[in-house]
């Protein structure tokens, strides 16, 4: 067996998977903390709610997969925001008040 294809000593598959889940949680939390300075909080909540409703409830995917899909959507939203010329820290942004009723539960890191 090629030594490059072996798992390094002290790294079992369970540890690697656990590290991936921990990374996903840390990344989502950090992304949400940054995104709240650039995108309306309501938009972030809506992306979280719709990701959960579609990927978890409708498609029956795992919680980690749902979080991963949310992460991809938010990364894309932040990328588009920055490429359009971010001026949020100088000018700020509105609350995104297009939705009536109570706000949805917050995503991880914004509770």
Curated annotation (Swiss-Prot):
Any one annotated GO CC term: virion component
Q: Name the Pfam families on file.
A: VPR
Would the keyword Ribosomal protein be found if you checked this record's keyword annotation? no
User: What's the superkingdom here?
Assistant: Viruses
Task: List where in the cell it is found.
Answer: Virion; Host nucleus
Region Binds to human NUP153: list its residue ranges.
Answer: 60-79
Which terms does the UniProt entry file under GO BP? symbiont-mediated suppression of host innate immune response; viral life cycle
* Intervals of motif Nuclear localization signal: 64-71
Q: Quote the InterPro entries the UniProt record gives.
A: Lentiviral_Vpx_assoc_factor, RetroV_VpR/X
Which key words tag this protein in UniProt? AIDS, Host nucleus, Host-virus interaction, Inhibition of host innate immune response by virus, Viral immunoevasion, Virion
User: Gene3D superfamilies recorded for this chain?
Assistant: 1.20.5.4730
- Can you tell me which family this protein belongs to? Belongs to the lentivirus VPX protein family.
Subunit composition and interactions: Interacts with the P6 region of unprocessed GAG. Interacts with host VPRBP/DCAF1, leading to change substrate specificity of the CUL4A-DDB1 E3 ligase complex. Interacts with host NUP153.
**Function noted in UniProt:** Plays a role in nuclear translocation of the viral pre-integration complex (PIC), thus is required for the virus to infect non-dividing cells. Targets specific host proteins for degradation by the 26S proteasome. Acts by associating with the cellular CUL4A-DDB1 E3 ligase complex through direct interaction with host VPRPB/DCAF-1. This change in the E3 ligase substrate specificity results in the degradation of host SAMHD1. In turn, SAMHD1 depletion allows viral replication in host myeloid cells by preventing SAMHD1-mediated hydrolysis of intracellular dNTPs necessary for reverse transcription.
Mind telling me what this protein is named? Answer: Protein Vpx
This protein's gene is called: vpx
